[in-house]
């Protein structure tokens, strides 16, 4: 870990060896022929944060396979974010991956200043021009399925969700979990709390404890730290984005997973082929595209609801069942 002259933390991963396929893979011969492209990751939170860790791992894996050279900054504040984008563009990054939720307008302005650099960002807005693409974190399919399990497991008939900020993506994820609960248990009550930031595990824990005090006996942790409250009070919890089961073996029984690699593969392929990245890459992260899923500990929920959930899961993957997409702030 080092600092550049402006104080932004930089870590470097440069791996030139190749030989492993990338999964989507069609662009790998081209990537090998022209050499790895330089990709920068700008993380608004530490890479230990669940969302950032998913991006970080996908980028590290692509570097280990020889498709890219990966450099990154973490914990970049909103005020520093546009500057970090400019710096990486000036340093020759061909593709910049990150998140522009707090700086939507400023990020697009920076991208317009560097038309030869591709920017693909987690965003609540739309793509812009030829070089600014967007993606959403749409693991709501897995959240809905986990909600089905939770709806049949709750004994108090109250479940809770702890989220970051009520932006459309977070709202949709929490609403999907609640919809899954209601699909199998219409009388269940769903509590929602937002902690006002993307990374503050102690604050998420406190929000979870408050929901438990209000009667919730299962928590959905859109934010890391929620499971700490569940563990402390001896109740069950659902994780999001990554698999928390090994970290909380007696607490987290299901996880709504999200895989950034299909989105990254598509973006790299476009850059290598010289195609514009000014498009929406969100669909590559859907369950039916292999970009998200659910993992759960079998036998924790009743067998009949596991079977019902698996039936819906198969329908989602086949494209015959659509989980409702509700981006309104949960009430």
Model-identified regions with their sequence ranges:
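C-terminal segment of N-terminal export signals and the immediately downstream linker at the start
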Residues: 27-42
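Short beta-strand elements at the ligand-binding edges of bilobed clamshell
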Residues: 127-151, 161-166, 249-262
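An alpha-beta-alpha
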Residues: 59, 145-188, 192, 280-301
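Extracytoplasmic "Venus flytrap"
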Residues: 38-62, 71-81, 101, 166-171
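N-terminal secretory signal peptides
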Residues: 1-10, 14-30
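Short beta-strand elements in bilobed, periplasmic/extracellular small-molecule ligand-binding domains
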Residues: 66-74, 187-198
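Hinge/cleft segment of the Venus flytrap/periplasmic-binding protein
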Residues: 273-331
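Periplasmic-binding protein-like
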Residues: 93-100, 120-122, 214-224, 240
């Amino acid at each position: 870990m080092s600092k550049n002259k402006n104080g932004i933390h930089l870590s470097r991963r440069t791996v030139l060896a190749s030989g492993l396929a990338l999964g989507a893979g069609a662009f790998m011969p081209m990537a090998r022929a022209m050499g790895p492209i330089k990709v920068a990751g700008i993380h608004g939170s530490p890479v230990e944060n669940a969302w950032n860790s998913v991006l970080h791992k996908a980028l590290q894996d692509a570097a280990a396979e020889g498709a890219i050279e990966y450099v990154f900054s973490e914990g970049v504040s909103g005020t520093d974010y546009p500057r970090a984008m400019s710096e990486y563009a000036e340093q020759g990054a061909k593709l910049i991956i990150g998140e522009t939720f707090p700086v939507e307008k400023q990020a697009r302005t920076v991208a317009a200043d560097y038309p030869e650099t591709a920017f693909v960002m987690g965003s609540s807005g739309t793509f812009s021009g030829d070089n600014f693409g967007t993606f959403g974190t749409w693991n709501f399919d897995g959240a809905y399925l986990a909600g089905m399990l939770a709806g049949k497991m709750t004994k108090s008939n109250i479940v809770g969700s702890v989220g970051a900020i009520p932006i459309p993506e977070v709202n949709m994820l929490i609403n999907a979990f609640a919809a899954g609960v209601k699909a199998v248990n219409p009388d269940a009550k769903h509590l929602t709390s937002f902690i006002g930031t993307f990374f503050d595990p102690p604050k998420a824990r406190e929000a979870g404890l408050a929901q438990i005090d209000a009667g919730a006996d299962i928590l959905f942790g859109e934010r890391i730290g929620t499971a700490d409250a569940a563990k402390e009070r001896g109740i069950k919890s659902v994780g999001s984005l990554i698999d928390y089961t090994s970290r909380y073996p007696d607490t987290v029984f299901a996880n709504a997973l999200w895989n950034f690699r299909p989105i990254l593969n598509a973006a790299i392929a476009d850059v290598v082929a010289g195609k514009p990245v000014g498009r929406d890459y969100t669909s590559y992260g859907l369950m039916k595209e292999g970009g998200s899923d659910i993992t759960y500990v079998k036998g924790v929920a009743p067998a009949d609801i596991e079977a019902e959930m698996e039936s819906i899961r198969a329908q989602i993957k086949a494209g015959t069942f659509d989980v409702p997409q509700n981006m309104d702030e949960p009430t």
